[in-house]
Amino acid sequence: MKAIRKVQKEKTEWQNIQIISFGIAGADEVFLEKIVELGGWDLLDGIALHPGRGNFTPDFPVIAPWEDFKKPAFGYQYWNYYGSIRVVKNFIQKHGGDKDLYLTEIYALDYPNHSWNDTPREAAENLLLSYALAAAEGVKNALYYQLFNSVWFDHLGVNATNREYFFGMINRDLSFKPSLMAFCNTAEVLDKAVFKGWIRMDEKHPLSRGILFD
């Protein structure tokens, strides 16, 4: 990256080219610290995160998003969506706060009959919540994985025993999943939306909250 930055100085238009990290799988703070230690941090314009998610909603484990978030001491500390975003955002702030955050792999796969994945209905709901949370956190870009079922090395292939074939929003027979409808509606509703804050419910429901956009 040092060589690239040196070349960029040769032409003004090249200096506008942004360099972001490759997709870091989960909020791997140890790896991020290593980037800082080896001098790579100051050469990056942004951090790319694959937040990942298991069999819980995207807002897990952030209970009160209006408060500072600390990684839980036990349970699923790592492979969660919103928790990972908050951890990496905190890391960016700790090291200067001058890096954009990119989510390069949001997903809501619906591999059937498996406790670690969503049902088709859950996938639609969780896709919407994933993007709403990303918008609330000021994420620069959030890319969904992926449009069609199947995998890159078996285009339009079918494998009922491999969960990697079920990340798409469109089935192999080209029928639409509920998640595609959710994606279209989310894109329309959040287009140019500005995050205004968290809606806190009454004292009887302290864990209930909403997200306000304008």
Residue ranges of predicted features:
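Aromatic- and carboxylate-lined catalytic core of secreted/periplasmic carbohydrate-active enzymes
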Residues: 131-214
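Noncatalytic carbohydrate-binding groove/subsite architecture in carbohydrate-active enzymes
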Residues: 1-130, 137
